[in-house]
Amino acid sequence: MGLSVNTNVASLNAQMNLSKSSSRLQQSMERLSTGLQINKAADSAAGLVISEMQRKEISGLSGAIKNIERGVNAVQTAESGLGEVNDLLLKVRSLTVDSANAATQDSASLAANQAEAGKLLASITRISDTTKFGTTNLLDGSFSAKQFQIGAFSGENTSLTIADTDAASLSIDAIDMTTTAGANAALISVDAAISTVAMARGTLGAFQSGTLEATKNNNTSQLVNLQAAESNLRDTDYQKEIASFTSEQIRSQVASTVLGMANQSSQQIVSLLRG
């Protein structure tokens, strides 16, 4: 190749290659230091868009899982309260059965059973009025069509209603077991109340396992898969990147050496002129 004073083509090519290598080296260093292979849109416009959409869904699923966990806690609190109500109803039922045994009961015994039943019914109403999750009443009838956000997006929700379970709502607040006939009627009412509470507990159990926990399992599976996909797309593969960084360092060193050699051609021209 001839020597030229105005344009050193070899030097220009070497400078261009060195600039490209330096840029790639800087990008590789950024990936290694941040742990991300996509740090800005210029790194991969399409990849960044996909990654951000995945991050949005990951955030939504994480929030939904927390919502479900709180929902499970609320349902378990309500079911525990209903369990207490059921235990009290069984005690009331025992008193009604005892009062219905006319052959061995006198008026004093019937009155004592009635008084004891009254205390138990008051406890049932107290539990109904005071069972709460946080500040939310669960068993007083105000928990009606309450919404649970169980998915990552709008509309992915479900609702639950828990009926009032105080003595009046269970139609047992006015039972009278001071007579045999009254005790028999009370037994029918108490049995109906026990069935109502059992159905409510069954509904809560089905809602917890069939809706909340099943959805949580599905959300968790989606979350794990999305996190893996987002990581593969955005996170740095250190083994690959270190190899790339090492290779680029060598290219940069070679380009620097070539540039130095190319610039020596200008000195050759000066030497020739000096003769």
Please place each PLM-identified region on the residue numbering.
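Primary detection of the long, small/polar-rich alpha-helical "axial" segments characteristic
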Residues: M1-G275
